[in-house]
Amino acid sequence: MRILQETSLAAFHTFGIESQAYALIEAESVDDLLLIWRDKQYQTLPKLVLGKGSNLLFCDDFSGVVVLNRIKGITVNETQESYLLHVGAGEDWHGFVQWTIEHNMPGLENLALIPGCVGSSPIQNIGAYGVELQDICQYVDILNIDSGEVSRLSRKECQFGYRDSVFKHELKETHIIVAVGFTLKKEWEPKTTYGPLAELNKTTVAAIDVFNAVCRIRQSKLPDPQVLGNAGSFFKNPVITQSIKDALLYQYPQMPNYKVSNLEYKLAAGWLIDQCDLKGMQIGGAKVHEQQALVLVNTGNATARDVLLLAQHVVNAVNDKFGVLLEHEVRFMGASKETTLSEVLA
C-alpha cells in the first residue's frame, strides 16, 4: 500500500481535468484494500476505486479517498479445449490483450486498445468489433468490503448487459473486483464481420492480423488521451424498438442500425451526432472530436462544467432531430458519489 502525497486527480483519469481528492492511495492486494476500508482515518469518508480512470469524469473535487487498484498477476491453466486465465484487476487491459497474443492464446484481439484495467472490464461489459467481455469471461472475483471475504461470481451472476453489469447496480457500493477469469478456446475462430474487419480474409487471417487491424482502426478513429484528454465513447449506442427504427429509417434510409433482438435495434450514436453537424462543436475547453463525433475531448484547459454543458448540448440536439435520448457511457463522479448528467446540471 502506498499513500501518495499528491492529491490532484488530473493524472489519474484520461480526461485529464484538474480536480482534487482528500487522499490518493495505491492498493496492491486484497489486504491493502481491507486496511484502507478499516483505517479509522478514512472509515467515514466516501471511497472510489479506480483502475486507469478511462471511463470517468470528475464533476467536482472528490471529498474522500480515491483507491488505485494495482492488484497484478496472470495465472494460466488449461484444459483440452481451452486456456483458463486468472488475471489481477490492476493489470492494464491492452497490455493483457497483447500478452495473450504473444503467448498464442487468441480470443481477445477484437478488444485491443480499449483503455482501462482488467478489473473495470466487467463493470462496463466492454465490447468492440463484434466481441463483448461476456463472451470470454468465466468468472469475476469480488471482495465484500464489510465481511472481508472474497467470493466468485459466475458469468451468469454478473448479469451482463449492453455496457452494463451487476457491478453498476447491486454490488456497486459493497464489493470490489479483485480478479477476472477468462476462458479462451484453443480452436480459435476469427470475429471479422464487424465494420472494416470484414475486409480481412477469414480463411487465412491470424489473431495477430486482427489485433493489428483493430489497433490501426482505433488509432485512426479515436484520439490518444495522452494528446487530447478524453474517455473514449462518451455516449452509449441507443437501443430502440422496431417501430421507432422503422419510422426513422423512412425519414433517414441511410441510418445505420443493428438488430439486437426480435423487438430491439441498436443505433450508432456517433452517426446521430454527426447528422446534427456537431463535429468540432466547442464549449470552453471541451470539444466534439472532429474525426469521431462520439468522443468529447479536453483541448487542454477544459473544466468539468465545459464537458457537461457540451454533453447536454449534444443530447438535446440529437433528441430534437431524431427523438432519441442519448445516455452517457462515461461515469460521472460528484463530490461524494456517482451522479448523472441530469442531476449535476439540475
UniProtKB/Swiss-Prot annotation:
One of its GO terms (biological process) is cell division. Residues 17-187 form the FAD-binding PCMH-type domain. Its main location: cytoplasm. One of its GO terms (cellular component) is cytosol. It is found in: Cytoplasm. Pathway: Cell wall biogenesis; peptidoglycan biosynthesis. Keywords: Cell cycle, Cell division, Cell shape, Cell wall biogenesis/degradation, Cytoplasm, FAD, Flavoprotein, NADP, Oxidoreductase, Peptidoglycan synthesis. SUPFAM superfamilies: FAD-binding/transporter-associated domain-like, Uridine diphospho-N-Acetylenolpyruvylglucosamine reductase, MurB, C-terminal domain. Its cofactor is FAD. GO terms for molecular function: FAD binding; UDP-N-acetylmuramate dehydrogenase activity. The active site is at R163, S233 (proton donor), E329. Its EC number is 1.3.1.98. PANTHER family: UDP-N-ACETYLENOLPYRUVOYLGLUCOSAMINE REDUCTASE. Cell wall formation. Belongs to the MurB family. This is UDP-N-acetylenolpyruvoylglucosamine reductase. It comes from Photobacterium profundum (strain SS9). The lineage of its organism: Bacteria, Pseudomonadati, Pseudomonadota, Gammaproteobacteria, Vibrionales. The gene is murB.
